[in-house]
Amino acid sequence: IVLHQRGSHVPYGALLQPQDKVFGEANIVDKYDNTIHKTDQMIQTVFEQLQKQPDGNWLFAYTSDHGQYVRQDTYNQGTVQPDSYLVPLVLYSPDKVVQQAANQAFVPCEIAFHQQLSTFLIHTLGYDMPVSGCSEGSVTGNLITGDAGSLNIRDGKAEYVYPQ
């Protein structure tokens, strides 16, 4: 099962119910934090439902397609600011073999890339595909096509590559 939620997008909190606005709405950071709180609640609900599965044959994976650069006077996505591309990655399975494979693939990494997660999931589903490493990856600029350039990260060093 794949769940894709709206999550934390502008206008922050517009889709939340009043009881979900636990940080108030005094400023943009409070509004953004409300959306994070709602995401945390969703993650908890999904995780609790998975734990009720009797066979324990599941893998919970949570990540985001992008982060948000949020300050009082600036908020956006799709930039090459680390806040825009460093996103959470949570993996959990009650299956010890899957846990061991996840630890082997991700624990050595300071940064994991979506390509690495994708190949890990494909491999875990039983397909013959090696899991990508975490020594290099790319982040597209503000256009997913790459027409605005990309940030290439290799061994912890980032270099912006402009399109030809």
List where the protein language model places each region:
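Catalytic domains that recognize anionic headgroups
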Residues: 1-164
